[in-house]
């Protein structure tokens, strides 16, 4: 139980996939203008990350490894992620049509979000991870992505009404803000020993 808590804290704070490992930067910069959109995408991405971690673990453990087809791992994981994202898109469309319209093109683009494939591949490369550890890592990565995305959206909403000097407006202030957030998350680096 302690190990699962450490994996969760590590994925959320210490080794955050966005600010430390630089995965998932496209939606991080693209969907973070409004906090409502960021919350919706973060929930969908957390759901996809958790489900993709489960499905990719099952595929790796019970299909690819026993049949000695591990060279097909990346293609298999991409197919699994595409199916999970399609399922999520149908679920969001059915349960929240407004959120579906607000997210627009970003919902199907979760398929190409490198954080989803990155978590699946990192779980597959860790032989010591069992089912619960892989699922916890996927869920923690989703929570970490959600935390960073919502915090960044809140900061960008405040910056949008602030008096920013002309050379720093737009993407420049966004990158500076992301860099400062990354520095803040570096403070968690000593929290868990490797």
Swiss-Prot record:
Its EC number is 7.-.-.-. Part of a membrane-bound complex that couples electron transfer with translocation of ions across the membrane. Keywords: Cell inner membrane, Cell membrane, Electron transport, Membrane, Translocase, Transmembrane, Transmembrane helix, Transport. The chain crosses the membrane at residues 4-24, 39-59, 71-91, 102-122, 135-155, 172-192. InterPro entries: Ion_transpt_RnfA/RsxA, NqrDE/RnfAE, NqrDE/RnfAE_oxidrdctase. Its main location: membrane. This is Ion-translocating oxidoreductase complex subunit A. GO terms for biological process: electron transport chain. Belongs to the NqrDE/RnfAE family. HAMAP family: RsxA_RnfA. It comes from the Bacteria. Pfam families: Rnf-Nqr. The gene is rnfA. The complex is composed of six subunits: RnfA, RnfB, RnfC, RnfD, RnfE and RnfG. It is a multi-pass membrane protein. The keyword S-adenosyl-L-methionine does not apply. It comes from Pseudomonas paraeruginosa (strain DSM 24068 / PA7).
């Amino acid at each position: 139980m302690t190990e699962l808590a450490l994996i969760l804290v590590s994925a959320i704070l210490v080794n955050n996939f966005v600010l430390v490992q630089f995965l998932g930067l496209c939606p991080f910069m693209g969907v973070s203008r409004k906090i409502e959109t960021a919350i919706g995408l973060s929930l969908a991405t957390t759901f996809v990350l958790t489900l993709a971690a489960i499905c990719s673990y099952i595929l790796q453990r019970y299909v690819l490894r026993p049949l000695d087809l591990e060279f097909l791992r990346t293609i298999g994981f991409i197919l699994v992620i595409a199916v999970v994202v399609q399922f999520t898109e149908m679920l969001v469309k059915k349960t929240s049509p407004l959120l579906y319209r607000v997210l627009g093109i970003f919902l199907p683009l979760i398929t190409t979000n490198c954080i989803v494939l990155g978590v699946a591949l990192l779980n597959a490369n860790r032989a010591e991870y069992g089912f619960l550890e892989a699922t916890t890592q996927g869920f923690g990565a989703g929570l970490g992505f959600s935390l960073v995305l919502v915090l960044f959206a809140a900061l960008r909403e405040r910056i949008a009404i602030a008096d920013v000097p002309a050379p720093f407006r737009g993407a420049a202030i966004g990158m500076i803000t992301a860099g400062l957030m990354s520095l803040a998350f570096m403070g968690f680096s000593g929290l868990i020993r490797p």
